């Protein structure tokens, strides 16, 4: 499995994480842009999804979403409950309370 820093620039990851280091400040639109995901090909987005899908279930569940920033770098903070729910709501198009790979790529593209 690749590391996030092999897919995206380390300085972009750091900048994005620093921008949202305050609890409650997370905005997935801005984050995906800052971190350099916007405009990346589907294959790259799928690799990123694979890193964030910690249990390799094919979905990012709410519990994993909480750690989404840590997926980009170990120093990332945990999302608050409200931030996690907002991200889930934004990404979950079919209402199954988790984000599949296609939902994830759509979420990034909509950012």
UniProtKB/Swiss-Prot annotation:
SMART domains linked: EFh
Gene Ontology cellular-component annotations: cytoplasm
Keywords on record: Acetylation, Calcium, Metal-binding, Muscle protein, Repeat
Entry annotated with the keyword Metal-binding: yes
Residues given in the record as Ca(2+) 2 binding sites: 92, 94, 96, 98, 103
GO molecular function annotation: calcium ion binding
Residues reported in the UniProt entry to bind Ca(2+) 1: 53, 55, 57, 59, 61, 64
InterPro entries: EF-hand-dom_pair, EF_Hand_1_Ca_BS, EF_hand_dom, Parvalbumin
PROSITE patterns documented for this protein: EF_HAND_1, EF_HAND_2
Domain EF-hand, chain residue ranges per copy: 40-75, 79-111
Positions of post-translational N-acetylthreonine modification: 1
PANTHER family: PARVALBUMIN ALPHA (PTHR11653:SF2)
Other observations noted: Isoelectric points of C1 and C2 are 5.4 and 5.0, respectively.
Protein family (similarity comment): Belongs to the parvalbumin family.
Its biological purpose: In muscle, parvalbumin is thought to be involved in relaxation after contraction. It binds two calcium ions.
Full protein name: Parvalbumin alpha
Species name: Latimeria chalumnae
Species classification: Eukaryota, Metazoa, Chordata, Craniata, Vertebrata
């Amino acid at each position: 499995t690749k590391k996030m820093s092999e897919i995206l620039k380390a300085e972009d990851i750091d900048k994005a994480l620093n921008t949202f280091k305050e609890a409650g400040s997370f905005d997935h639109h801005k984050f995906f842009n800052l971190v350099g995901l916007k405009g990346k090909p589907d294959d790259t987005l799928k690799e990123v999804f694979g890193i964030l899908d910690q249990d390799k279930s094919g979905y990012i569940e709410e519990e994993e979403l909480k750690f989404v920033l840590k997926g980009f770098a170990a120093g990332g903070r945990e999302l608050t409950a409200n931030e996690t729910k907002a991200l889930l709501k934004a990404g979950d198009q079919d209402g199954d309370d988790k984000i599949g790979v296609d939902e994830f790529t759509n979420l990034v593209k909509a950012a």
